[in-house]
Curated annotation (Swiss-Prot):
Quaternary assembly: Homodimer.
Protein name, entry field: 8-amino-7-oxononanoate synthase
Highest classification ranks of the organism: Bacteria, Pseudomonadati, Pseudomonadota, Gammaproteobacteria, Lysobacterales
Family: Belongs to the class-II pyridoxal-phosphate-dependent aminotransferase family. BioF subfamily.
Protein residues bound to substrate: R24, H137, T357
Gene: bioF
Length: 401
């Protein structure tokens, strides 16, 4: 029997995406200046990046990268366990562990890689199970599938659902994994309650706080610290370096024994080149600023309030988010795509999020705020969204939810 032709399969899938108007397109950014982006020769005010504290172009951060590149070169040249583990890597692991109140840390190339490494190294038996919130990030869900253990999911934020799923899988070792801040909804997981569930069910509680660290909690220590928890309740926690810290990579902090096990057995850690030391040096500078500059978080909180007050005043449906991620529900895909296009015409770049990233009927504008935005820019965005709604609502079959 002939094998399926991969080229034919790819062609068919492409035709289906075109018919569904779900083709994904990369937009090329020419230059950046703070929150402004040059795209297709036009300067747009961006409300779409994860640079929550505005550190990616901060002078001290860029200078640290340039100085380290001149000294150490463009790359680490090897994996951590050969000769790629530089002083900058060791210092960053130590500084982030100390900042978050954990005894140990391990640096990875990305959050996706780190989530895979954690589950592959810890959930290695067929009977092992990872119980997850249904809206967890794709990297957490894919990591379970790739690790080969069982995946059980509970309804979003449903603590009792998490308990039921753990009780229903008593045979092997168990991990309870949750986002801290959910990337598409902007809401925060009930970490205290989930930590109690994990303890009662003898499961390791693992929190992916990609969007929380730097923004929430004392000194920006994230969701775990904001909930009054630490290593005793959350033995492993993921911190990404490409969101509030403005760089690239990820760090897993945790108990010493767990971190040592990851360093010795996690294949995504062992068999990959370490991050460039210059990039790590930039993140070291960003961590210092994130810890020190409470004004960035204060300003961000004020801007979030400005946006939510303005959107509510005009009758928009908001989600339960007090974080820089502010989704604006639009309903169907054609509506959100038309809204995003209208905003671009008005000079704003806002991401349109649609299925399969979010459920059917839950397409949304994903507004993200930065400490670099001004109140005037936020108000101008609200005004532009109102105008876009009016324009789109007059088009056939275009009604904002």
């Amino acid at each position: 029997m002939a094998r399926p032709d991969l080229h034919e399969r790819i062609s068919s899938l492409r035709k289906l995406r075109v018919a569904q108007e779900r083709v994904r397109v990369r937009r090329q950014v020419g230059r950046r200046d703070g929150v402004r982006l040059e795209i297709d020769g036009r300067w747009l005010t961006g409300f779409c990046s994860n640079d929550y504290l505005g550190l990616s172009q901060q002078f001290e951060v860029v200078a640290a990268l340039q100085d380290a590149a001149a000294r150490d070169g463009a790359g680490a040249t090897a994996s951590h366990l050969i000769c790629g583990h530089h002083t900058a890597h060791e210092t960053l692991e130590r500084d982030i562990a100390e900042w978050l109140g954990y005894p140990s840390a391990l640096l990875f190339g990305s959050g996706f890689i780190a989530n895979l490494a954690v589950q592959q190294a810890l959930l290695s038996e067929e009977d092992d199970v990872c119980v997850q919130d249904r809206l967890n990030h794709a990297s957490l869900l894919d990591a379970t599938r790739l690790a080969g253990c069982r995946l059980r999911r509970y309804p979003h934020l449903d603590v009792e659902g998490a308990m039921r799923q753990l009780k229903g899988a008593p045979e092997g070792a168990a991990m309870l994994a949750s986002d801290g801040v959910f990337s598409m909804d902007g809401d925060v997981a009930p970490l205290r309650a989930l930590s109690l569930v994990a303890r009662m069910q003898e499961a390791l509680f693992y929190v992916d706080d990609a969007h929380g660290v730097g923004v929430l909690g004392p000194q920006g220590r994230g969701c775990v610290a904001d909930a009054g928890l630490g290593v005793a309740e959350v033995p492993l926690q993921l911190v990404t370096l490409g969101k509030a810290l403005g760089g690239y990579g990820a760090v897993v902090v945790g108990e010493e024994a767990l971190i040592r096990h990851l360093a010795e057995t996690a294949r995504p850690y062992i068999y990959t080149t370490a991050l460039p030391p210059a990039q790590v040096a930039a993140t070291l500078a960003a961590v210092r600023l994130a810890r020190r500059d409470d004004w960035r978080r204060t300003r961000l909180t004020e801007l979030i309030g400005t946006f939510r007050d303005g959107a509510r005043r005009h009758g928009f449906e908001l989600m339960a988010s007090d974080t820089p991620i502010q989704p604006l529900l639009c309903g169907e895909e054609p509506t959100v795509m038309a809204m995003s296009a209208a905003l671009e015409q008005a000079g704003f770049m806002v991401g349109a999020i649609r299925p399969p990233t979010v459920p059917e009927g839950k397409a949304r504008l994903r507004v993200t705020l930065s400490a670099l935005h001004t109140p005037q820019q936020v108000q101008a965005l609200v005004d532009a969204i109102v105008q876009a709604r009016d324009v789109v609502s007059r088009q056939p079959q275009r009604a904002l939810a």
